[in-house]
Amino acid sequence: MDWSRAKNILIISFVILDLFLGAQYIQMIQTQSKIIREDQINRRQIEELLDQVHVRANMDLLERKMIPEQLGVYKATVSEMEGSWKQEEQGSYIRTFSPRLSCKNEQDLEQILKQQIPFFSDFRYAKALSSDQRRVYVQIVDQVPLFNGKVEVFLENGQIESIRVLHFSQLERLSVVSLVNVHTALYRLITNWEFNANATIKSGNIAYRSKVYNSVDNEHILIPYWYFESGKDYLFIQANSRGQNEEVEKMSISNPNSKGTNET
């Protein structure tokens, strides 16, 4: 074997060894990161991460938010609406009024909704999602908002033009899960989402989101999430302490019916 060939083999061997050691190092860091994320992440580490990605957050405000230690995971079905209600592709029901219904004020509006929707008492007004042309009411489960379950009232000149309803019923608790704290939730968010430069995380809280479980029987799974307000969006990350799925989902605050995304 000539020296040139031997040298090439030696170089290739070093490259392979370097790649192997690099892979081992990355795996070690990921393993350590997992331990930190679940058990040891603290405010100082979060603030360092925020600095690295050039994102601002009011940590005092975020840490003051009181959340439950545990929440249920539920199986549920979409409630059916009869009569003049028409079912839409995504499972919600809509009713259009011609002529439009008059309402004098917010109390008058809610009284009309109670007459039109038999389970309206399951919903609460969501000011952040509402506007002059649309009122949004979010379903409450275990005293926590379920963002997919909602009543939307579309207004024209102060009159009701149409109402859209998506309500979940026949809730069956499948399990109880422990929820991660705000530090772990922020860690998952920061390490799984590409923020715009100089973005701000304004607030954080817990909510449910629904996932289709059985499309034939119209069954859904209700899962607890942390959600954070950033810019014009809510960013959702699973709140389960086991962290099976750490993808970030985005929902537009001004258009909550827009399709969620995992991209910036």
What do these predicted regions represent?
Residues 40, 179-181, 254-256:
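Short, charged/polar low-complexity linear motifs in solvent-exposed/disordered segments
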Residues 185-264:
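Extracytoplasmic/luminal low-complexity segments enriched in Pro/Gly and acidic/polar residues
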Residues 115-157, 205-239:
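Exposed beta-strand-loop-beta-strand "reactive/processing" segments of non-cytosolic proteins
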Residues 1-145:
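Preferential activation on post-signal-peptide N-terminal prodomains/segments
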Residues 154-186:
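Short helix-loop boundary/capping segments
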Residues 103-104, 142-148, 169-174, 232-238, ...:
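Short, surface-exposed beta-strand/loop "edge" segments at domain boundaries and coil↔beta transitions
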Residues 34-37, 149-152, 168, 175-178, ...:
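Surface-exposed beta-strand edges and their flanking turn/coil or helix-capping segments
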Residues 116-125, 183-194:
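Short low-complexity stretches enriched in small and charged residues
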